């Protein structure tokens, strides 16, 4: 009258000692399988670090050479500008007729306005009148 249960699936029941041994065997096999991939991962991780380190050193050397080239080109492009600024400062200090040297498109600089204000305010009054007229024109549109 014994019917096979789902746990036995028609197999004969075995002694508890045999079943415990199989469980222990399975338990021992699982950690060995799990440890093997971890060890291989550790090996690959340590081998990746020196490669990255070497890559950055090479990259750093390239950047340094590029930086030197960039700095040289920047110095060449900055030097003419600095020379012009230095000359402009010398001219504004030495001459009061700089406004006459300017073309029709160029207006007096802020430094020139400051110099004019120290000499007299008549020039500023004229400038203010012109700016007021231009603002009124824009308001009529």
UniProtKB/Swiss-Prot annotation:
Residues 84-103 have a biased composition (Acidic residues). Pfam families: SPAN-X. Residues 1-10, 66-80, 132-141 have a biased composition (Polar residues). Residues 1-47, 66-141 are annotated as: Disordered. It comes from the Eukaryota. Residues 11-26 have a biased composition (Basic and acidic residues). Signal peptide: none annotated. Belongs to the SPAN-X family. This is Sperm protein associated with the nucleus on the X chromosome N3. It comes from Homo sapiens. The gene is SPANXN3.
